[in-house]
């Protein structure tokens, strides 16, 4: 089930909005801003409040794509997380050394697994090369340089040199910065190709992606995909990529049919959940009897009719289950539709089956817990409590667990009469949402009633002492 994730960006992405530049430095700031549009750093500000989504099936697939690449890049061990951004434009970017952000538009527009793997390899090249840290430092230095050159230029203008002296210094710095950015992009390409070679994969997908966007460089920025603006594609860069990629012994290697099927099912699921039903039925007509097409139509059938469409949607899911009875995410889908239709009992059965087929699925475990809470019985609530605590403990995909999971945990504690633990869970929910003030209020209330020195008491003490100025 595709769910809305925590909109709060990682701590490295939280930044204050820059104030308006003064009149004297306006053009210099415009130059720096223009550079940042050409870099992945542009997304640091845009990422505030990113509409992140969570889905076990898709996250598992992307992890299978990325894990070998990250290992080859020396970034393995679960250090890097793939995060999914709900946006229909093609884009992927990094803002730190911990996360790679991929838009749903990139996932749905990529025809093959290898194309997305190539994008991930390129972004891994940026992380391994320390490009963002280097670019931040370069921008910091050159902002100072621009200011000094502008002061000197103003002096020259007063002396009779004219405004051209001011603009010339700005342009020199901008050209230098853009040259460095182009060098970083080319270096990330080459690192990405090395990672693909080390893992026995083709560079064809990366080449196809950059060829696709090369022509967009001639369009205005408003009509370009964000990926083009953050990854400038020069003709000589594509030619170099073509030369290096085609020399690999793996260039002609294709994705396996099984991996291609999983990729197509991901695209179908995203279409079903995120696009209008009419669009889905047009994209996947009834004449298409493939599993991905059936998958997309089952989702669209439910969302077109709501609870009234449940019988037809369930019938379509049951047909999918006849073809793949051990595929956990068809069972998850069955549970999702029943839960949305107020049939908690049926949802519990479906989620139990899904979890038995994928025991590490913390998201499905949370869904099962919410279905159990909907039964509103003490035994079900006690079972839900155990699932929620385990889900929070085991979820390593997000930097912080979802606020919604903590709220469900609080609900379970309240029902069982465990008010201090419930207040502690609400404090965590507010903190995960970025509402530190409310988090401190509930943390103080919880701490006053908890056993002194207990793990939860110590955690509440940490929240109370948290300094928002850090």
Feature map (PLM): residue ranges:
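Extracytoplasmic and endomembrane cell-envelope/extracellular-matrix remodeling and assembly machinery
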Residues: 47-49, 54-56, 60, 82, ...
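Helix-start (N-cap) detector for alpha-helical repeat units in TPR-like alpha-solenoids
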Residues: 291, 328-329, 362-363, 399, ...
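Structural motif corresponding to the intra-repeat A-B loop/turn of tetratricopeptide repeats
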Residues: 304-307, 341, 375-378, 416-417, ...
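Canonical positions in the second alpha-helix
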Residues: 320, 353-354, 390-391, 429, ...
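Short coil turns that delineate tetratricopeptide repeat
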Residues: 325, 359, 396-400, 417, ...
